[in-house]
Amino acid sequence: MYGGYSNQNYYQQPSGRPNDFQQQGNMPFSEPSQPMFSTNYMKQQGSQPSLQDRLTQQQSQPQSHNNQYYPNGGFTDVPNLNYPATPPPTQSIYSHNNNSNSKVYQSAQHTSPGQYSVASESGLYIPPPLQQQQNGQQSPVRSVHQQTQQTPPTFTQQQSSSQPQSPQHNTYHAQQQQQQQQQQQQTQQAQQQGQRQTQQQSQQQAQQQNGSANNYMYFERRPDLLTKTTQDKAAAVKLKIENFYQSSVGYAIERNQRRLELESELASQDWSEERKNRQLASLGKKESQFLRLRRTRLSLDDFNSVKVIGKGAFGEVRLVQKKDTGKIYAMKTLLKSEMYNKDQLAHVKAERDVLAGSDSPWVVSLYYSFQDSQYLYLIMEFLPGGDLMTMLIRWQIFTEDVTRFYMAECILAIEVIHKLGFIHRDIKPDNILIDIRGHIKLSDFGLSTGFHKTHDSSYYKKLLQEDEAKKQQQQQQQQQQLNLQKPQLPNETNNGNRNTMLVDAIHLTMTNRQQMQTWRKSRRLMAYSTVGTPDYIAPEIFLYQGYGQECDWWSLGAIMYECLIGWPPFCSETPQETYRKIMNFEQTLQFPDDIHISYEAEDLIRRLLTHSENRLGRHGGADEIKAHPFFSGVDWNTIRQVEAPYIPKLSSVTDTRFFPTDELENVPDSPAMAQAARQREQMMTQQQGVPQSNAKEDLPFIGYTYSRFDYLTRKNAL
């Protein structure tokens, strides 16, 4: 039993029963995954070389069976059968049926007949399906049946056919034939599907050549062929869609954040489950009310006007009362046409974003914002204490303790604006408001700017596609401002001593102090004009060069100087003269001899009113200014809970004694505001409703509407 195998058939089992290879009949050969006998075992028999060794020797020699891809094929002792060790590059067709019998039919490129194979999931190479050419000629690809007939039988097949076959062999052979039939059916289905795809492709190519193919439509963007009105409408629709989804996502994020904050707060409280559930239910009710509010469109008819409390270059501020709730607000009205004509679109958007994005006690709260065809409306909280300019007019000069209090609060307010990513650029006593408890809040962000694209004027210029003539005109105006001649001032060095002011400045006499008081009152009228006042603007802003948040610290130094000295550091009779003094601040910044201030106060002012690269707060921000010795002893965390130096006393919620309402009666409306008012009144008289605005002018104001969530629970709402 363990003798040599030299006299036996290598494919004949010792029992005389046909082996598995003989039972496969006409099935093609497959390369065995493992050798039939161990090499060491064969060497131990001491007989002639084993089949494995013979095959290894034959595979190492080049074969010449007219097979250019298979020089080292396997089983070369069997004629006309070559199985490559490495298959050539193939093209695959995937076939799948409901019985999960999947195959990939692979065909080698540029091969001769008989070299096509089918790769099954089991790794066997099976002959490919029969493919017929469309012209009726026989394809070089042969079917399994054809290949079996054309291939001459091997000596193993002849030997197996001469031997008697057992019933078990017949059953196994029948199963193999059934599998072959199934494979032939699958290949025929794949062939038919490939023929149908080929016919469809040929038909499509023919239709395209005849010019009758209309399966594809080619579009070209040609907005120049459309009218300007159509382009504006398309741009408006695009912005509305973007704003809708942006606001919806933002509201969902805020709603989820409010829920998480309340749950975190309730988890830290030792309350009963019933009380916690009531708090959650109350939040859900508020969310529902706010959702209805967002769907409600506010208008001017929802408010009753009480009186005018402020006027500006582009609008006015009124004291109003909401009809349904009776609460008092300050309504700021801006004329759309002036915003558009005076290139204030970016500033308007920045102001709205600052007020809407801030929930700080140092910034005026915005409750609603809406618009109509002519105006933009900002509904803000009403601060009955007036502004810092009113206090300066009444008290003339502050002590250092009072100045320290208000400057410390201004630092905290400016810090909040900077953390939001904005630059105010217009900090002055007029924009520092006093609340009912005497603490300050920043307002009027009409000149503020941020890092968002909608806060840049170039965004709106591109959006509105301004003509080149207007751009050139603006560039010429800017160039003229840069070419202003600087004043010929004497070359005086400032070694830190307090020198008297220059000859062309205001003299420090009692008579001139009375003139300064007159200047203060006229200063209010200057704020109402379109020119404005440059007393608190940093020099780098005038140069139209790059500047950062440090420009707001210059304004803080100018306000501090005015609180301690009694007038701004560079005040003059005309804005042009003020501009020249600011540009030469090294020579024009002087401290009077008859007014005593501490060394710390003067040092802080000088370190704020200096070049931007050396200015205090440029590198360390607000913390750098807080660390100055002038603010020694200030508790920055509880300063808003400290009693203010001055608390306004009011007789009613509509008391406006701290606002210059008497002066406003003598201030005429701007021509644009007067014309818009006449146009609105005329349209209302004719019962034609509010006049319709130009779609182009409405384009930059998409997304201006806003509603605050906690408008019902704000404690500072009157």
From Swiss-Prot:
TM stretches of this protein: none
General function of this protein: Protein kinase that seems to play a role in the regulation of cell morphogenesis and proliferation.
Top-level EC class: transferase
Recorded GO MF terms: ATP binding; protein serine kinase activity; protein serine/threonine kinase activity
Organism per entry: Kluyveromyces lactis (strain ATCC 8585 / CBS 2359 / DSM 70799 / NBRC 1267 / NRRL Y-1140 / WM37) (Yeast)
Sequence ranges assigned to domain AGC-kinase C-terminal in this UniProt record: 632-716
Low complexity bias spans: 1-16, 57-68, 131-168, 175-209, 472-489
Domain named Protein kinase: residues: 303-631
Source species taxonomy: Eukaryota, Fungi, Dikarya, Ascomycota, Saccharomycotina
SUPFAM superfamilies the record matches: Protein kinase-like (PK-like)
Disordered: annotated span: 1-211, 470-497
Active site: D426
SMART domains for the chain: S_TK_X, S_TKc
Keywords: ATP-binding, Kinase, Nucleotide-binding, Phosphoprotein, Serine/threonine-protein kinase, Transferase
Protein name per Swiss-Prot or TrEMBL: Serine/threonine-protein kinase CBK1
Residue ranges, compositional bias (Polar residues): 20-56, 91-120
Enzyme Commission code(s) on record: 2.7.11.1
Residues reported in the UniProt entry to bind ATP: I309, G310, K311, G312, A313, F314, G315, E316, V317, K332
Similarity comment: Belongs to the protein kinase superfamily. STE Ser/Thr protein kinase family. COT1 subfamily.
Catalysed reaction equations from the record: L-seryl-[protein] + ATP = O-phospho-L-seryl-[protein] + ADP + H(+); L-threonyl-[protein] + ATP = O-phospho-L-threonyl-[protein] + ADP + H(+)
Gene name for this UniProt entry: CBK1
